[in-house]
């Protein structure tokens, strides 16, 4: 073939590939997903810094304590993740329906819930911590470090939960810049304070907790300033905000109930990994903390696509536009599938080097290498359930999300029966089964709705 013809065919092939993988829907998805990916990865980046900073102290007890404390915090706060999820779905639907009064309601009502729940957690933190550490069990030295971490960390509860609402609302109105500023500035501040308080002032686990508390309240202030700006842009008046606490509160509570039950099952499964890992020894819990940081980093990055799907799915639901919904879904599958595969390749080729950066403890590095294969498998298994979560959140189909999570949790529990034979591998196998079942069950429900034409039916 003459060189000129070869170049022509190559150029045509590249254009066809770009047309297939970068349609207008793909570009619209990336417009919202890309800033969310970059802002999202600052969240696990904070976890990476926590792990790296604490992991370079002179004992694995500190790392284990932060792992237990972070898991308890995640379990409790993520039970209230419905504050962000329901806010995003309802806000996106109001945005699609072009209803400013509904937009005001989807901000004020969940914000009141968040501040009330956060205040209760801060006031009652000591008995809740006692209960959490009693359930976890394990090394007394690790539990003591976890207690020191949590006594300070949970003072941030009102701000942390309010920030979930602000993030959900900003995402729902598709103002991509605001969530980026909210997450990036807050988490960078957290990272800087983390290094200074832990390494500079030698505050150990208390320093890591205090850094997060300061950063959460700073983020809340920034978020409120951003929301104030966007209220003006969206034509939402002060009178609308004053009356926004009224009306449809029962629907919000019912929606949040189902999402909270879903979140409870999710956190029970992830909490089981820490609890059962702690009973396998201090080294195992430290190893799993390092590996879970990698998984969290991947999940948050891929959640950038899920967040974009939430916003577009909710907008399409509010406008009753099935064509837009299907275009966004196909674009999300293409783009997030490629990114998930890239994560798997990176962990396959450079996983050992990444672990070495996170901890200088040789025994932890060597032990972590045995379980690295799960970090290669999990991105390509988990990406589909993240995307489908976005579809269902946007449509506020919380009951079906709850039922899907129940199926996945049952599969997780059954897989744990292999623990006496597989040891720590059983924990990671159970997590893989859990993510796979979430994706498969949601896909089956989505397929049924699409065939029957019932996706846009009232929820």
Swiss-Prot record:
It holds the Pfam family MatE. It comes from the Bacteria. The chain crosses the membrane at residues 2-22, 29-49, 63-83, 111-131, 154-174, 180-200, 207-227, 265-285, 289-309, 338-358, 373-393, 416-436. GO terms for molecular function: antiporter activity; xenobiotic transmembrane transporter activity. InterPro entries: DinF-like, MATE_fam. It is a multi-pass membrane protein. GO terms for cellular component: plasma membrane. Belongs to the multi antimicrobial extrusion (MATE) (TC 2.A.66.1) family. It comes from Escherichia coli (strain K12). It is found in: Cell inner membrane. This is DNA damage-inducible protein F. Induction: By DNA damage. Keywords: Cell inner membrane, Cell membrane, Membrane, Transmembrane, Transmembrane helix.
């Amino acid at each position: 073939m003459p060189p000129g013809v070869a170049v022509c065919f190559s150029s045509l092939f590249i254009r066809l590939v770009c047309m297939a993988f970068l349609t207008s829907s793909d570009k619209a998805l990336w417009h919202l997903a890309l800033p969310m990916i970059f802002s999202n990865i600052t969240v696990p980046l904070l976890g990476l810094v926590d792990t790296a900073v604490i992991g370079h102290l002179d004992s694995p007890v500190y790392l284990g304590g932060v792992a237990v404390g972070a898991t308890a915090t995640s379990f409790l706060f993520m039970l209230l993740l419905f504050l962000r999820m329901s806010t995003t779905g309802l806000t996106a639907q109001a945005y699609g329906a072009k209803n400013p009064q509904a937009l005001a309601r989807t901000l004020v009502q969940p914000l009141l819930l968040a501040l009330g729940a956060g205040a209760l957690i801060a006031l009652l933190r000591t008995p809740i911590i006692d209960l959490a550490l009693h359930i976890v069990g394990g090394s007394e030295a690790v539990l003591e470090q976890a207690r020191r971490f949590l006594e300070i960390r949970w003072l941030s509860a009102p701000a942390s939960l309010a920030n979930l609402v602000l993030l959900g609302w900003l995402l729902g109105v598709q103002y991509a810049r605001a969530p980026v500023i909210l997450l990036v500035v807050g988490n960078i501040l957290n990272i800087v304070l983390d290094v200074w308080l832990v390494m500079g002032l030698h505050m150990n686990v208390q320093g890591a907790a205090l850094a997060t508390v300061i950063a959460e309240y700073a983020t809340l202030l920034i978020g409120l300033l951003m929301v104030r700006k966007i209220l003006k842009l969206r034509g939402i008046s002060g009178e609308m905000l004053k009356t926004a606490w009224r009306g449809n509160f029962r629907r919000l509570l019912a929606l949040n109930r189902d999402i909270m039950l879903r979140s409870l099952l999710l956190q029970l499964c992830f909490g089981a990994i820490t609890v059962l890992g702690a009973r396998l020894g201090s080294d195992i819990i430290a190893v799993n903390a390092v590996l879970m940081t990698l998984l969290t980093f991947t999940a948050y990055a891929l959640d950038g696509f899920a967040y974009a799907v939430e916003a577009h799915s909710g907008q399409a639901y509010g406008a009753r536009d099935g064509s837009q919904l299907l275009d966004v879904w196909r674009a999300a599958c293409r783009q997030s599938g490629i990114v998930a595969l890239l994560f798997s390749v990176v962990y396959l080729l450079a996983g050992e080097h990444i672990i070495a950066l996170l901890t200088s403890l040789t025994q932890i590095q060597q032990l972590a290498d045995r379980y690295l294969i799960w970090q290669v498998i999990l991105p390509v298994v988990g990406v589909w359930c993240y995307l489908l979560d976005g579809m269902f959140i946007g449509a506020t189909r919380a009951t079906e999300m709850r039922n899907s999570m129940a199926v996945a949790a049952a599969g997780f529990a059954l897989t744990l029966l292999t623990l006496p034979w597989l040891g720590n591998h059983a924990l990671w196998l159970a997590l893989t089964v859990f993510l796979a079942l979430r994706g498969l069950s949601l896909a089956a429900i989505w397929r049924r709705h699409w065939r029957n034409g019932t996706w846009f039916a009232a929820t």
